[in-house]
């Protein structure tokens, strides 16, 4: 009986030691997809405020973008690397937080090593994120080139 009580007490203590999720204060930013073929030809930030704008974007690119998510009070932000001549390029989410009136998002840009064997094909990597529709004046995406980039609230 004493062992069971000690075990339960130890488990309660350990449950308080669980690591925080990587987004921390930026829990309001949700990664929808990280794609290698979005179809956006130039590096940049694209903001879609509703499903109609998202459908217009999907119709204008030769790529694979996810469906509009059913998330209230959220817009979609696409951070794009543009066309790349080979495979092996990518962009991933690191963290997000508020910096005054700015929504600041940190990304990790990856490229193949110079001596890596990669597929010779055009790719267009991007990161699709759901961000809050209000409460910020500017969104800033930070990381290696082509970032940092900013986009004002419309």
Say what each PLM segment does.
Residues 1-2:
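N-terminal secretory signal peptides that target proteins for export/translocation
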Residues 17-154:
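Exposed, flexible binding/inhibitory loops of compact, secreted disulfide-stabilized domains
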Residues 5-15:
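Bacterial N-terminal signal peptides
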